[in-house]
Amino acid sequence: RYGLPCCEDASGTSHEAAFAIVGMGKLGGMELNYHSDLDIIFIYEGEGKTRPVAAADPERFRQQTNQQYFVRLAQRIISILTLMTPEGHVYDIDTRLRPSGNQGPLVSSLPAYRQYHESSAAPWERQALIKARVVAGSTELAVCFETFTAEIVYERPLPDNLAEEIYRLRQRMEKEIGKEDARHRNIKTGRGGMVDVEFVAQYLQLLHGRDRPSLRCRNTLDTLAGLLGEGLLAADDCEKLTSGYKFLRRLENKLRLVHDQSVNELTSDPASLAKLARHLGYEDSLGQPEKLFLDQYAETTQTIREIFNRILQCPGDSLDEP
């Protein structure tokens, strides 16, 4: 009915426009966990219009712009992935990492995507591109996209206040999303949580990735290993960040299995904590399992936060100050 989306190459020759799906976040880093949603972006090769396919009924053909066509396609993909069935649904989908977030179009042409990142993107969007990976679609478009993102992330000059930018972003996340208090702990965005480890890794990638291509990893643990190999992260820090990150990731898995939903908050209820601790392997014979677990959690997050503060902290400032 809508035909094929077409665009022109540099010589003016018309051809079918390519399409791809970009995985961001945990999907891009191949770090999906139980109940992880999919952070995705839809891109297409370039602007143009659809043309009828061979043997198409001209009475039924409805020409569309490429953007209109690919918006329909993206909506169809989201609908299939999120369709609720008696067995549940496949994934929750999050497309807010696209240019301009929810205010922007659902799909972007590669030239428009590039222009956005060259002129309008916020510093955190450059950081988010570290994990961008084409997960489906045209191989040729994937090469173009990943070449461009490597240039944006690693080849462009860095702001003089890079550490402060990342540090302030972390502050906002902890305050607005973590929202910790005496009764609530957030293992992802809270103090010493997984985001602390990820931001340390990403800060050092941005700082050194231009001259050291081996650091251009999407996976956090691979990045930590690469930083160690390049002599940019002390062995003791690397071991503590790696073991701490694995502990928190395993905790996230168990927490989501116990609750059968996407959660990152620890309850203050002793019975629920004891149940979670037993799932993690803390034995009753060694004492109260919830206390043993909370002691290790406190020690792990404190260690992670100390390393984060040392590497990223602005002079005379502290993320832990009220």
Model-derived regions, located:
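A nucleotide- and high-energy phosphate-metabolite-utilizing enzyme signature
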Residues: 1-322
